[in-house]
Amino acid sequence: MSRFCCFGAGCSEFSGHASTSSGKGKGIQGQVKVSYGFYLVRGMTNHPMEDYHVAELAEEKGNELGLFAIFDGHLGDTVPAYLQKNLFANILNEEEFLTQPDRAIIKAYEKTDQAILSHTPDLGQGGSTAVTAILLNGRKLWVANVGDSRAVLLKGGRPIQMSTDHDPNVERSAIENRGGFVSNMPGDVPRVCGQLAVSRAFGDRNLKSLLKSEPDIKVEDIDYTAELLVLASDGLWKVMNNQEVVDVAKRFKDPQAAAKQLTAEALKRDSKDDISCVVVRFRM
């Protein structure tokens, strides 16, 4: 049976057996016209789709918000599904959200992770990355992330990486200080205790003593030089660099078409993982 899932002005049809899903929407925040589109493709794997997204224009206490996210799950889809439903709500419910957004985001990430861990019997032993972008009144963009899902802003004609790839090798010292290790097997990526390919994530109860869910956060002004934002799971970033991604995306006025083309290009480059992509365009 199909179900309809609408985000802001966009609407997409999802089917339990479908290998793709897509949608788009648009609105105005202050002087900025915002349009967005998303496209998701299930990878060449035996498990169900583990990538989830959010793409929505909303209003909170008289403020106009753009809420965009990618959640890339592992060992099941229960944790990314939980994040899709709860993470932004938890951020917006923080009293400090409008006065100290950075602090509110960090607190909400931690509270959400604790809630996931407390629901382990229901949510299982899996986990998820997260990259979240909040556009406030068309003027400020906050991006936070844990894991290797990435956000890149095209501004002033150049790509600005708004997220941090949490690589086990980079955080090796912290992992070892907590009693863990990082494996580097030939032909494989670095992994925490030979298992997880990221050093920060939601969930992952069995590795939680070695992992953090504290996000890195970056803030940028959105002005006339800001053209577009791309959020995607590592199914895209494993085979395309930041410059290549924005070069493809900027060719399309329709952000949904841009997202679809990016996933097609990743598949052409032999990406086997789930691929999820959200493209947001800004126009003054």
From Swiss-Prot:
It catalyses: O-phospho-L-seryl-[protein] + H2O = L-seryl-[protein] + phosphate; O-phospho-L-threonyl-[protein] + H2O = L-threonyl-[protein] + phosphate. Pfam families: PP2C. Binds 2 magnesium or manganese ions per subunit. Its EC number is 3.1.3.16. GO terms for biological process: signal transduction. GO terms for molecular function: metal ion binding; protein serine/threonine phosphatase activity. Its cofactor is Mg(2+); Mn(2+). InterPro entries: PP2C, PPM-type-like_dom_sf, PPM-type_phosphatase-like_dom. CDD domains: PP2Cc (cd00143). Mn(2+) 2 binds at D72, D234, D273. Keywords: Hydrolase, Magnesium, Manganese, Metal-binding, Protein phosphatase. Mn(2+) 1 binds at D72, G73. SUPFAM superfamilies: PP2C-like. Belongs to the PP2C family. This is Probable protein phosphatase 2C 41. It comes from Oryza sativa subsp. japonica.
